[in-house]
Amino acid sequence: MLQAEPKTRHPMPDAILKLHSGRNLAYAEYGDPAGLPLFFFHGWPSSRLQGEILEKSAMKLGIRVIAPDRPGIGLSDFEPNRRLIDWPCIIEELAQHLGFDRFHLLGLSGGGPYALVTARALPDQVLGAMIVCGAPALAEFGKEGLLWAYRLAIWSQRNIPFALALGLRAAGWAAGRALNEWPMSWFSKLYPAADREALSDPLHHRVMMLSSRQALFGDAQALTHDGLIYCADWGFDLSKIAVPVHFWHGDADANIPLQLAQKTATAVPGAKFTIMPDDGHFSLPLLRTEQILRGIIA
């Protein structure tokens, strides 16, 4: 049986923007509706619903969070042959729709590259970017130390894509189980202590798993395409980023090794890199949210 958990708070209804391309872009809003604009880019596999992890701190600090679904994820329409460098135009269009002249970015895990490419492409509009547990430039720096599940997904997509599609559905089912139920009880043993503590909070667990299930039970082709973007050439030069970028990474991150994150950060001129002792891939964004967001309003 699924464990009863508290409902997530959804302050604003999901919104849909019809892009100039004719495709629909879905997004959710969190935090202070009159606050400082911040685009939140979700991880992989995840969705706009992950933005709720910022809700409490964003409301407290006066930040308005806009969390879009990437194409083909959640409620957004799929865009075949999409590249990482196609993302900034989508965000620019969304910003114009919302009336934002300037804004901040926060990329979590797989959302990190999307924040970096947007910072590169829109220097006159981006005030700064936060990269939290960010995915590294795999084509440039390699995959050594990357979580085994990520490496398996990359290999499967290239060799037996039908098996990956089945695996993603199975992962969606697993994400619906409580932490003390199989198979989550087994997977949780692979997490560092800080991650287990963070996910033991029923609300944290529900937000993270619900956002993942939204992606995992969606279009498998879109999700795998989104994943393959990370290991392809990103299509832009990190050294050309001209806005402030602050990387945050836990030294106990079992998903994305610290050394790969550091290599990516080193390629960004003037980037700040904060190492959080004992934090993992989940505890950092779930338990240190206010500390991270305070860096935006400082």
Task: Go through each PLM region and give its residues.
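The serine-hydrolase catalytic nucleophile loop
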Residues: 43-56
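Short beta-strand/loop motif that positions the catalytic acidic residue
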Residues: 241, 247-249, 253
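Conserved alpha/beta-hydrolase
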Residues: 58-77
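Catalytic active-site module of serine/aspartate enzymes centered on a nucleophile-bearing elbow/loop
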Residues: 270-298
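Alpha/beta-hydrolase
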Residues: 149-152, 156-236
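Conserved hydrolase catalytic core segment
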Residues: 101-145
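Conserved acidic catalytic loop of the alpha/beta-hydrolase fold
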Residues: 86-104
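Glycine-rich "HGGG/HGxG" loop immediately N-terminal to the catalytic nucleophile
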Residues: 49-52, 71-85
